[in-house]
């Protein structure tokens, strides 16, 4: 019986060590996914492929950590582009018929995003 317990512990240890470590979305992933939105959000072009990017980001942000990381990146981007139309940014989810759990705005508290 002791040998069975040792084998079970070894198998459990291997499962923990080998399990993939999930990492939050990076700002690079978020910005590349939403790059098609920039012309639209800066009043320089049509909506084009923007909604595909918004829907793609929604699909990538499956966990709370991912959603908070995406929120922080979008918040930072919204603050850094001086000619970004914040009204268009805030309405982007409804324009693209998607539901995200936060407003795209420099004032969003990303720590509260679930």
Curated annotation (Swiss-Prot):
Coiled coil location: none
Disulfide links within the chain: 27-73, 37-50, 51-96, 71-110
Keyword Repeat on entry: no
Signal peptide segment: 1-23
Domain of life: Eukaryota
Alphabetical keyword list: Disulfide bond, Lipid-binding, Signal, Transport
A molecular function GO annotation: lipid binding
BP GO terms, sorted: lipid transport
InterPro entries: Bifun_inhib/LTP/seed_sf, Bifunc_inhib/LTP/seed_store, Plant_nsLTP
Family: Belongs to the plant LTP family.
Function according to Swiss-Prot or TrEMBL: Plant non-specific lipid-transfer proteins transfer phospholipids as well as galactolipids across membranes. May play a role in wax or cutin deposition in the cell walls of expanding epidermal cells and certain secretory tissues.
PANTHER family, per the entry: NON-SPECIFIC LIPID-TRANSFER PROTEIN 2-RELATED
Protein name: Non-specific lipid-transfer protein 2
């Amino acid at each position: 019986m002791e040998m069975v317990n040792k084998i079970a512990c070894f198998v459990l240890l291997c499962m923990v060590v080998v399990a993939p470590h999930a990492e939050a979305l990076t700002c690079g992933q978020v910005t590349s996914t939403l790059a098609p939105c920039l012309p639209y959000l800066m009043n320089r072009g049509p909506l084009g492929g923007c909604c595909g990017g918004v829907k793609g980001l929604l699909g990538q942000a499956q966990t709370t950590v991912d959603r908070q990381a995406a929120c922080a990146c979008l918040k930072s981007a919204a603050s850094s582009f001086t000619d970004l139309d914040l009204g268009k940014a805030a309405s982007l989810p409804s324009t693209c018929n998607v539901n995200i759990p936060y407003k795209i705005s420099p004032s969003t508290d990303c720590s509260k995003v679930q």
